[in-house]
Amino acid sequence: MAKEVAGLIKLQIKGGAANPSPPVGPALGSKGINIMEFCKQFNARTQDKAGKILPVIITYYADKSFDFVIKTPPVAIQLLEVAKVKSGSAEPNRKKVAELTWEQIRTIAQDKMVDLNCFTVDAAMRMVAGTARSMGIAVKGEFPVNN
């Protein structure tokens, strides 16, 4: 018989750096989940992604056991890394903080494709480019048309 799902918790944690302090401790402790067990498992699975912010979806069950799925880093974080800037623009319509090429956008879109709700790389590229524009990061040239 399948376990009864009691709920979901969504967090963003740095890879390899989960510890019982906030936000992890209070979020898991209030649901009765073993915090140290989660931290050990998460840190073991994210050693290769140390320092990167990773979204994690934790499914916890009525018997206090849990499973979790680690997603790819958010698009905004990836854009900041590729553009080599610390933050987006406070006025994205007026002040641009960086400029990316469509090839860089394609790389991010292909990396994030598994987590996005789109079917083609072109659609994913448009989503990533929209996020970049809203952060004050310009995209060079026109959208490449594949023939």
UniProtKB/Swiss-Prot annotation:
One of its GO terms (cellular component) is cytosolic large ribosomal subunit. Keywords: Methylation, Ribonucleoprotein, Ribosomal protein, RNA-binding, rRNA-binding. It comes from the Bacteria. The keyword Lyase does not apply. SUPFAM superfamilies: Ribosomal L11/L12e N-terminal domain, Ribosomal protein L11, C-terminal domain. One or more lysine residues are methylated. One of its GO terms (molecular function) is large ribosomal subunit rRNA binding. InterPro entries: Ribosomal_uL11, Ribosomal_uL11_bac-typ, Ribosomal_uL11_C, Ribosomal_uL11_C_sf, Ribosomal_uL11_CS, Ribosomal_uL11_N, Ribosomal_uL11_N_sf. GO terms for biological process: translation. Part of the ribosomal stalk of the 50S ribosomal subunit. Interacts with L10 and the large rRNA to form the base of the stalk. L10 forms an elongated spine to which L12 dimers bind in a sequential fashion forming a multimeric L10(L12)X complex. Belongs to the universal ribosomal protein uL11 family. PANTHER family: 60S RIBOSOMAL PROTEIN L12, LARGE RIBOSOMAL SUBUNIT PROTEIN UL11M. NCBIfam families: L11_bact (TIGR01632). Forms part of the ribosomal stalk which helps the ribosome interact with GTP-bound translation factors. This is Large ribosomal subunit protein uL11. It comes from Bacteroides thetaiotaomicron (strain ATCC 29148 / DSM 2079 / JCM 5827 / CCUG 10774 / NCTC 10582 / VPI-5482 / E50). The lineage of its organism: Bacteria, Pseudomonadati, Bacteroidota, Bacteroidia, Bacteroidales.
